[in-house]
Amino acid sequence: MVQNIAILGASGYTGAELVRLIATHPAMRIVALSGDRKAGMAMSEVFPFLRHLDLPRLQKIEEIDFSSVDLAFCALPHATSQAVIADLPRDLKVVDLSADFRLRDPAAYETWYGKPHAAPELQKEAVYGLTEFYRDEIRGARLVAGTGCNAATGQYAIRPLIEAGVIDLDDILIDLKAGVSGAGRSLKENLLHAELSEGTHAYSAGGRHRHLGEFDQEFSKIAGRPVQVRFTPHLTPMNRGILANVYVKGDPQAVHRALAERYLTETFLEVLPFGALPSTRDIRGSNYVHIGVIGDRVPGCAMVVAVLDNLCKGSSGQAIQNANLMLGLDEAEGLRLAPVFP
């Protein structure tokens, strides 16, 4: 049975990535696309690379008839999804790609996002969408909150190590490099080619990046006590991709073994042989995560390197993976795409 899909916020990067992936999904059909500022336009006018697809025109959200929609992806900007999802039919399954429902604690949301949550009841209902760790909850969920792309990368490298008890919880450092598409499609001076090309810079440094809220929430939940990591992201002049260097105290072989055993049966998570390190070029355009482990010159320390595509596994691909579970489909349906190389 083919499921009818609506994509709200289809004129942004994550919305376009949803369209690209769902176009070849055997059990999903796009029946509605929203883009309020571009309502009435064809998707091919906004994204010419989608010209060959037969897609509905962009509409305003209030113009969409949700009575025939089985699931909606909400790819709207942060702080916008709360009111929009609150107004959707209560029986409609929703996967939200924004930050609006990732944090379970209303106080934590206000701390990291600077304003009270406008839909606290939905915040309590939402299931955190890190698929490989919440798939049972996701199967029965009505609302799933997509993870932050940086938060997902770091968690794939660290969560099994906390679960296995093989690292010092008080000494975790994440040094992360991210592609520019993670900053969205709106015009910003610092994202102009002349400003960004041939350079890289740290941003939201000093413990200010909002994805730290997800690290705090998830790592503390696993450990059963507060866990805080040090995390600094860097913006790099590539379109797609995230590379996280994670520095931990723990036996390197034990670290590698914990990751390899935890992800042995996972479709999209691959742990490389000990000493091999991954590259963002090898997962570009795909839903795969590659993880490598190497020892450090300091005895008893290890470095874990994780890479993923921020638009795919870090956002839209993972959203479809979650939607597959919510709709009773094969979790990997429509997502077994080979990476784009070179």
Curated annotation (Swiss-Prot):
The active site is at C149. It is an enzyme of class 1 (oxidoreductase). CDD domains: AGPR_1_C, AGPR_1_N. SMART domains: Semialdhyde_dh. GO terms for molecular function: N-acetyl-gamma-glutamyl-phosphate reductase activity; NAD binding; NADP+ binding. Pfam families: Semialdhyde_dh, Semialdhyde_dhC_1. Belongs to the NAGSA dehydrogenase family. Type 1 subfamily. PANTHER family: N-ACETYL-GAMMA-GLUTAMYL-PHOSPHATE REDUCTASE, CHLOROPLASTIC-RELATED, N-ACETYL-GAMMA-GLUTAMYL-PHOSPHATE REDUCTASE, CHLOROPLASTIC-RELATED-RELATED. This is N-acetyl-gamma-glutamyl-phosphate reductase.
